[in-house]
Swiss-Prot record:
This is Protein CDKN2AIP homolog A. PANTHER family: CDKN2A-INTERACTING PROTEIN (PTHR16148:SF11), NF-KAPPA-B-REPRESSING FACTOR-RELATED (PTHR16148). Residues 19-124 form the XRN2-binding (XTBD) domain. The keyword Nucleus applies. Belongs to the CARF family. It is found in: Nucleus, Nucleoplasm. GO terms for cellular component: nucleolus; nucleoplasm. The gene is cdkn2aip-a. InterPro entries: XTBD (IPR021859). Keywords: Nucleus.
């Protein structure tokens, strides 16, 4: 057909000159070749068989409509755009004799969701340079996978009541100048002698906790006991602070935004050819959020400083990344570098948008050994168990 078009334009130089006026500046040669054929096949319905089309600036309504239909058809064939059914039927009928041999294939959002649902979502770290940590299998209820830690939380967490009892034992040990026993979060105990009442205990850091020791006593009535917990560990005073409770109002005011974000990410995935390991999930997620005038909130912390982790799963070189938007938790990831951790977290967040629907819910998460409420983006079939521990106190973020 390309030869027929060239022959026709050679015989009609005025029509050829007019076509160059409607040739888009950024239009590729391949797209223009087929759109030009579309215009020529339907030009006689607008201008007659032998008439030369009027210049584009004359605002000829029928001609403008033809040019618009040509762009609709080209966008549908080469970029996968969809339009209302009457428009699609019209342009497909106008192009029924045009054979496009090298058009790309496109996957609709519904086809993509159906395909992913059929084969299931793998929780492996494919596409990331290193595999962060071992993971447990996903449950049958569609529970969100965590790519950097095991879902189960260590039984060695020290609750606030245990901290109070420990302080009492330490204080009593000072009065009697006997050995003091120190308990870390993994329930390993070690005896530390208190040889001098004015000396200061230097306790090593384990599993992200640094315990400062008591300072000396001057007299029986002037005993002072100070315990400092640095990094992510909480003090006994913080444990006694009242817990803020989220309400349905917090979820309702954020849900409309994530409904729009769901549609934006879904169409972005369709245009990118679907969810795959080679996709830049970080860029995709950030672009979609910024298009809705929002910001992707990124937090990093060394894995060893994150509370509620089994001690044998920590690594000195690993970094944890947590993603939020509108103060709502999206996902977590772990890697040897910040870039890798963010890439893993972004991929886990994008997986959410492959589901039929995403909702903002109030879920329980661990923070410094205690349960706190957090706003979490999940799919509608999610069961709120085994969520990874929080990097920051969720109730101080909102």
């Amino acid at each position: 057909m390309a030869d027929d078009v060239s022959e026709f334009l050679g015989q009609n130089p005025e029509t050829a000159a007019w076509l160059e006026l409607v040739h888009g500046e950024c239009e590729s040669d391949k797209l223009w070749r087929y759109r030009k054929e579309f215009i020529l096949r339907n030009l006689s319905d607008v201008c007659g068989e032998a008439e030369v089309p009027p210049p584009p600036e004359t605002n000829h309504k029928a001609l403008d409509r033809l040019l618009a239909y040509s762009m609709v058809w080209a966008n549908h064939v080469f970029t996968g755009c969809r339009y209302p059914l009457p428009v699609m039927e019209k342009v497909l009928k106008m192009a029924e004799n045009i054979k496009v041999t090298d058009a790309p294939t496109h996957t609709t959002r519904d086809e993509l969701v159906a395909k992913v649902k059929k084969r299931g979502i793998s929780s492996s770290n494919e596409g990331v340079e290193e595999e962060p940590c071992k993971k447990q299998k996903s449950s049958d209820h569609g529970e969100r996978e965590s790519s950097y830690i095991e879902d189960t939380i260590s039984d060695g967490n020290v609750p606030s009541t245990s901290l109070n009892k420990r302080e009492a034992r330490l204080s009593a040990a000072q009065r009697t100048d006997v050995n003091t026993e120190f308990y870390d979060k993994s329930s390993n105990r070690r005896s530390l002698p208190v040889s001098n009442a004015k000396s200061r205990l230097n306790l090593p850091e384990e599993a992200g906790y640094k315990h400062g020791a008591t300072q000396g006593r001057k007299s029986h009535s002037d005993i002072r006991h100070q315990t400092s917990m640095k990094g992510p560990a909480q003090s006994s005073d913080n444990a006694l602070k009242p817990t803020r409770r989220f309400t349905t109002e917090h979820t309702k005011e954020r849900q409309p935004f994530f409904n729009r974000l769901y549609k934006t990410v879904a169409w972005k995935l369709v245009s990118a050819g679907g969810f795959n390991a080679n996709l830049n999930h970080e860029e995709l997620l950030n672009t979609c959020i910024e298009s809705l005038k929002a910001t992707l909130e990124v937090s990093f912390v060394p894995l060893t400083d994150l509370a509620d982790l089994p001690q044998n799963k920590t690594s000195q070189e690993n970094t944890v990344c947590e993603l939020r938007c509108k103060s709502v938790y999206l996902g977590m990831g772990c890697g040897k570098t910040m870039e890798t951790a963010k890439a893993v977290a972004s991929r886990e967040a994008v997986k959410l948008f492959l589901k039929k629907k995403v909702v903002v819910r109030i879920c329980k998460r661990k923070f410094n050994g205690r349960d706190v409420e957090d706003l979490v983006l999940v799919d509608e079939e999610f069961r709120p168990v085994n969520l990874p521990p929080a990097i920051k106190n969720p109730q101080e973020i909102v």
